[in-house]
């Protein structure tokens, strides 16, 4: 077979393979915009702790590795997840702890847990 054709087939094969990897790496769910307060889930779930008075504690807990969540006005709780490198979006959300933000992303519900894979935070 012609070397140029072989090279072209190789490039096409690699691109198809990468496309399949990307498709499987993206979470499956609906795109949503959710407004709520950024909280550390440990303190919020354990004692309902949130708000400006709890901000420094929440930052410390999140830096220690506790999960970060979003609580809406209706007390709906979402775990915050990142898409890139499976990171939980800490870089963006740590500085917004105890603030009200709008998160855009992909909502996934499974086993009683609802999580948003973050696309943007405003």
Residue spans for each PLM region:
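Intrinsically disordered, low-complexity segments enriched in glycine/proline and serine/threonine
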Residues: 7-10, 33
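Bacterial N-terminal signal peptides
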Residues: 9-21
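OB-fold and OB-like single-stranded nucleic-acid-recognition modules
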Residues: 23-122
